[in-house]
Amino acid sequence: MSKSRRVFLSMQGDDDFWGNGDRFEEHKLSKMNRRKCRGMMDTAKDDVLDEHFFKQNNLVTQELEQQNAKSNDMFRERQDWNSSTPLEKINLVESEDPVTCPENTEAKIHCSEVKVTEKMPLELDDEFYNNFREYFSSRPEVIFLTRSMHKDAAENYDKQFIDLYEKTRKRLELRSSPQINQILRCTSNTNATSSEIQLRNRQAVIVSNFREPDRRLGRYSKYYYHHNVGPEVYSRKVFVGGLPSCVKESDILNFFSRYGRLQVDWPSKHYECKSDSDPSLCNEPISSSSYQPSSHLAMVSPPFGEINPFMRNMPAQSESSQTGGFGRISSGSIGGFLNPGMAQVARGNLGFGSTKSDGSINGDKRQHHLGYVFLLFEKERSVRDLVLDCFEEEEGLFITLESSTDSIRVQIRPWLLADAEFLMDFNVPINTKLVAFIGGVPRPLKAVELAHFFEQTYGHVVCVGIDIDNKFKYPRGSGRVAFSDYDAYVQAITDRYIVLDHEDIHKRVEIKPYFFHNQSCEECSGRYHRQHAPYFCPSLECFQYYCEPCWHKMHSHPSRFHHMPVVKGV
């Protein structure tokens, strides 16, 4: 069944994914909770407590029960005594003034409270206040709630403070507010321990959005997990987009060199380069007869550790052996000297004219960018300084590039190392047999976005990783998705292709079984042939990894002859 045109997962809620006790976000959340509590208490005024909170306190309920029991005993004794002396009863009734309470429930409660306190002996009164002081010492949120209702409440636990507390409690027993539970949760969260916070936040599986709260604080982002142990935050490779054709490589170098030593690269710059993420792999000896610029040593961008790559260890030269003051032309030499092809490229980049290599490709066209470039910095600190100078808009980060002709706004897209891995749940173990390889992943896509896309499509996603290169730690365009359910894994492998829709990204990605470097054969378990398994049969009849002998053995039968293997590295 085709899984094209999937609707991307819409997020709700704002819980911490990881439950790792992120101090920055936890401190921020506590401030927000305090502000929310103050605003709710200003609107609620007197209806800000709940009987549910006070019913949890056994101490208060026991004291009230004892007081009611003692008051009932004293009332019965007085009735017995009055029945025995009728004359004194008349005098007592005439001497006592009737206490008139209004119809309001608050006034009745206040009157009954006055009667109880008058009947309470002095010794019981002191014990009552001492018990309340012990109770308040373990519940600091009571002070916060009581003072928010009564501005004249004292700072210490004196009798006036306890009386206000009792008055508030009795008032809320009759009139409870639905906002009370939320207020008490906010106040109690500030006093919760780190272990309780971790246990509560581990149950959260959904984030509110995919953009981190602050792009400049990548290490404090609460939606992502740092896979790197070191202090680095960004990749040393930065994407720069929105470049017009009039901007030259020299202009880019002159502007961004203020942040540190760097090189400029783009995919069409090195034809013989095997990996555009690491152009230094293409530094191979070349001949002048068949020249292809395969190394950025031949460009204007200087390599790391050299101020001028064309003037290193250069002896005295005659005017006839110099080429525009750059270096000596010697065929087949590369360690700081120019061969004919390098000299032609240097002239073309510096405005000496258009030259052709092998008479087929124009050097200027070959060395011109396609509207975007990659900045390869020597130090990660340079990327952080660059991000600090950028201004943020809805589309991302931008900076004004001052070239020789005009000032141009270009887009800066740094890669956060924290975006390379994402865990849905720490408590679920990762089964290496349920890991799928995702090919053709767009480089701007983060692991959290890829995880929620597959969670919405197939479900039961445990972990997602974006493959990065070893040198710059920049995405390679592929990823891995680990499932916890076998059926979800089988469905993903069976679909083979799926269209990924997210914002401006619309691309078809490939889903294949993931081959580990030491993948064992599931048929013989490596016991007989001692070989790794380079084949995987996606047919539901097999659906397992095979070494080469086991593949031929199991698929020699005519019923399995039509099975097509998925080969490692192909």
From Swiss-Prot:
GO terms for cellular component: cytoplasm; nucleus. It holds the Pfam family CEBP_ZZ. GO terms for molecular function: mRNA 3'-UTR binding; mRNA regulatory element binding translation repressor activity; ribosome binding; translation factor activity, RNA binding. Disulfide bonds: none annotated. Keywords: RNA-binding. Residues 434-516 form the RRM domain. Expressed specifically in the spermatogenic germ line. The keyword RNA-binding applies. The keyword Repeat does not apply. One of its GO terms (biological process) is negative regulation of cytoplasmic translation. InterPro entries: CEBP_ZZ, CEBP_ZZ_sf, CPEB, Nucleotide-bd_a/b_plait_sf, RBD_domain_sf, RRM_dom. Cytoplasmic polyadenylation element binding protein that binds to and regulates the translation of specific mRNAs. Not required for oogenesis. This is Cytoplasmic polyadenylation element-binding protein 2. It comes from Caenorhabditis elegans.
